Amino acid sequence: MTWANNIGLYQKKKYKDALEVAASKGTFVHDGIEDFIQNGNELDLDKVPPGYQKEVNFAYGSFKSWWTVISKRNVKVIMQEHKLVCPWFGGTLDLLIEIDGKVYLLDFKTSNNSSYKYFLQLAAYRYILKYYYDIEIYGCGVIKLNKKYIGFDEFIIDKSHPEYEGFMNICERTFLSIVYGFINRTLVERNYNNIFVG
């Protein structure tokens, strides 16, 4: 609520505008990460609007800090910025990576907050990877990249803890129930209109 008031009532900014700015910063960071992993290129800050450069640079630097740590292990990139689609939903995964022989599904976030909703998203991708690509995921995680200084937080859950696997299974069932609910509501509305509206 405080954040909404700060960008809305007191700062005279529209909520939608604030979301677009945040999304734009995240897009610059994601594009930089993609180019670095695929081609070894560093982020070109000259392509980033001046008002975004500081936060984008910190977030990208936070990624590089994470990458330096993870690169000390046996790492193989399987997919990056890859579109995943099934008949009912889809999205774009950030990174599917093998670390020491175990497959992890990772999502990079530049937002200031964390949410269980990130794991609903990962559960949806995990579902598609399992049933449409025959890829078994060992672990899922959110890598939160700081925009104020160089630093990152990892929110990783994997099969080494049974309660973590249980959590991901609940996330998958929850996400699928939302999808099924939407589909069924659409069918109810369509059938109602066919029967009563004509």
What are these regions (language model features)?
Residues 85, 98, 143-145:
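A generic structural motif
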Residues 113-120:
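Active-site-adjacent loop/helix micro-motif of nuclease/hydrolase catalytic cores
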Residues 80, 95, 140-141:
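A structural signal for short, well-ordered beta-strand segments
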Residues 128-198:
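Metal-dependent nuclease catalytic regions and adjoining charged, substrate-binding loops involved
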Residues 37, 41, 113, 127-131:
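Hydrophobic/aromatic-lined pockets within catalytic cores
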Residues 120-128:
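Short, charged, amphipathic alpha-helix that recurs within catalytic cores of restriction-modification
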Residues 1-90:
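Metal-dependent nuclease catalytic cores that hydrolyze phosphodiester bonds in DNA/RNA
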Residues 29-30, 91-112, 125:
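Conserved catalytic cores of phosphodiester-cleaving nucleases, focusing on short active-site segments
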